[in-house]
Amino acid sequence: MTGLFVTLEGPEGAGKSTNRDYLAERLRERGIEVQLTREPGGTPLAERIRELLLAPSDEPMAADTELLLMFAARAQHLAGVIRPALARGAVVLCDRFTDATYAYQGGGRGLPEARIAALESFVQGDLRPDLTLVFDLPVEIGLARAAARGRLDRFEQEDRRFFEAVRQTYLQRAAQAPERYQVLDAGLPLAEVQAGLDRLLPNLLERLNG
């Protein structure tokens, strides 16, 4: 039995984790096994790489270093969590995946898409998400929400131009493959965003049972 791989993407403050947990609850109510996870991270080793990536440092991190660390964490995550869960038939709900790399390291840092694609193929083989939910909202709203949470991590300290590029990359990728992506307006009240997730549930269940 093969499970279903669902990723949740979006800029800072888009509510991915909150909505991931909501979607998990709705699926579990139907007796479906759900594996919750996140990137970078998801395993003890990958979480240590996450700490390196997010912690502010006096030594600037080169963009290629950042990219390679992302994929190093992803390789461990795939081996330790994602592939085993899919093999069990679980629904994997992952807060960020490779679309975030295209958005942050590609759009934000300006690294070539071909470089990211080469690493994607090397690390993931033919594994791609079955469905990607993009939680979209204006940059200023997302940054205000992130600031309200407290101390900013290394990415959250980037400037507005960086996050505008991140947002546009997400939207461009969603437009290029509408069969895989669903864009949700994360600027709406939470109850309305979650009503949108409820409307997606039949599609999710059909994919899982198909």
UniProtKB/Swiss-Prot annotation:
Keywords: ATP-binding, Kinase, Nucleotide biosynthesis, Nucleotide-binding, Transferase. One of its GO terms (biological process) is dUDP biosynthetic process. ATP binds at G10, P11, E12, G13, A14, G15, K16, S17. InterPro entries: P-loop_NTPase, Thymidylate_kin-like_dom, Thymidylate_kinase. One of its GO terms (cellular component) is cytoplasm. The keyword ATP-binding applies. GO terms for molecular function: ATP binding; dTMP kinase activity. It comes from the Bacteria. Its EC number is 2.7.4.9. It holds the Pfam family Thymidylate_kin. The keyword Magnesium does not apply. Phosphorylation of dTMP to form dTDP in both de novo and salvage pathways of dTTP synthesis. HAMAP family: Thymidylate_kinase (MF_00165). NCBIfam families: DTMP_kinase. Belongs to the thymidylate kinase family. This is Thymidylate kinase.
